[in-house]
């Protein structure tokens, strides 16, 4: 449990596009009194910290530093964004061997100085690397969280909201499973302000059929690839997603977010990290919710878990 105190320290490991933008989003949110940036490229890290610090007059008081792992000591949350970036045409799972090796050097250093921190993994493939972090750190599963499908779920809400011309925040739904190509949309539990989506569409004379679901799902699944093809990387939306998770932890909100967590017995799925609706609070993941899926969704979720397990088993550097 995050203890109530006058200061809140967040460390961000990796000062690339995602890490730096995450630090910026955290700074704007006002959730931390200290943000520490760590990266192998020390010059860039110093530059990012300087640039952010120059905006001190426009946000709540926050001390932004660049440093080494020792400077992260006593962090409440350590956000891990370090790793090789996803290239055009490259899947998240193809990043695995590069990033596992990077994590083997990062995680022991993080743990050395942060025995009580909550670790929030953002680097891709996030589900696999969350599991790797869980194993390398020796931390309880509650304190090793992946950003999971929080961003994918926002993308799904955005797609539905855009088509139905409603506020995406009024759409209740989840993307579950891998943050990647095998993720699933939980149409069977999707609703618009507690009205089932099929009933809402029928009542409002809106499209809701197999073609609608396929188009929306494909747009969500391929969203990152589309962004990468156009601008080379995704970082704004994921930074906001990370900030949302951090706020839930620091505020002990006990809110439900589809983060990546260790699944132990859900539709027969065990010993793998997946994006699942979880209660997130001051202890990290307080409970994973076993929502009822239809047979098709459950089958796809099992396949998603198998995809991730096979990737882990085939990783040459484990």
Swiss-Prot record:
Active-site annotation: 179
Reactions this protein catalyses: (S)-lactate + NAD(+) = pyruvate + NADH + H(+)
Residues at which NAD(+) binds: 18, 39, 44, 69, 83-84, 105, 122-124, 147
Top-rank taxon: Bacteria
The protein's Enzyme Commission number: 1.1.1.27
Pathway membership, UniProt: Fermentation; pyruvate fermentation to lactate; (S)-lactate from pyruvate: step 1/1
Keywords noted in UniProt: Cytoplasm, NAD, Oxidoreductase, Phosphoprotein
Single GO biological process annotation from the record: glycolytic process
Sites of Phosphotyrosine modification: 225
Residues given in the record as substrate binding sites: 86, 92, 124-127, 152-155, 234
GO cellular component: cytoplasm
CDD domains: LDH_2
Subcellular location: Cytoplasm
InterPro entries from the UniProt entry: L-lactate/malate_DH (IPR001557), L-lactate_DH (IPR011304), L-lactate_DH_AS (IPR018177), Lactate/malate_DH_C (IPR022383), Lactate/malate_DH_N (IPR001236), Lactate_DH/Glyco_Ohase_4_C (IPR015955), NAD(P)-bd_dom_sf (IPR036291)
Gene Ontology MF, one: L-lactate dehydrogenase activity
Record family assignment: Belongs to the LDH/MDH superfamily. LDH family.
Subunit details: Homotetramer.
Function: Catalyzes the conversion of lactate to pyruvate.
Protein name per Swiss-Prot or TrEMBL: L-lactate dehydrogenase
């Amino acid at each position: 449990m995050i203890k109530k105190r006058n200061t809140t320290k967040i460390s961000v490991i990796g000062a690339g596009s995602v890490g730096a933008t995450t630090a910026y989003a955290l700074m704007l949110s006002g959730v931390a009194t200290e943000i520490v940036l760590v990266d192998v490229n020390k010059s860039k890290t110093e530059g990012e910290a300087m640039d952010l610090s120059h905006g001190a007059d426009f946000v709540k008081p926050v001390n932004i530093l660049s440093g080494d792992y020792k400077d992260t000591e006593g962090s409440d949350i350590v956000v891990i964004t370090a790793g090789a970036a996803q290239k055009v045409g490259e899947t998240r799972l193809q990043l695995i061997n590069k990033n596992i090796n990077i994590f083997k050097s990062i995680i022991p250093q993080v743990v050395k100085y942060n025995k009580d921190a909550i670790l929030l993994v953002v680097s891709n493939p996030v589900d696999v690397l969350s599991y790797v972090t869980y194993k390398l750190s020796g931390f309880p599963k509650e304190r090793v969280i992946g950003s999971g499908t929080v961003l994918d779920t926002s993308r799904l809400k955005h797609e539905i909201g855009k088509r139905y011309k409603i506020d995406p925040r009024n759409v209740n739904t989840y993307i579950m499973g891998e943050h990647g190509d095998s993720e699933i949309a939980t149409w069977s539990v999707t609703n618009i302000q507690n009205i089932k989506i099929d009933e809402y569409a029928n009542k409002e004379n809106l499209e809701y059929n197999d073609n609608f679901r396929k188009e929306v799902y494909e747009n969500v699944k391929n969203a990152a690839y589309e962004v990468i093809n156009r601008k080379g990387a995704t970082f704004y939306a994921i930074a906001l997603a990370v900030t949302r998770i951090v706020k839930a932890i620091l505020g002990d909100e006990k809110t439900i977010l589809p983060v990546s967590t260790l699944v132990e017995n859900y539709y027969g799925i065990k010993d793998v990290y997946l994006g699942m609706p979880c209660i997130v609070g001051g202890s990290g993941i307080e409970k994973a919710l076993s929502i009822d899926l239809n047979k098709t969704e459950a089958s796809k979720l099992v396949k998603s878990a198998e995809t991730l397990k096979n990737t882990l088993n085939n990783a040459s550097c484990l």
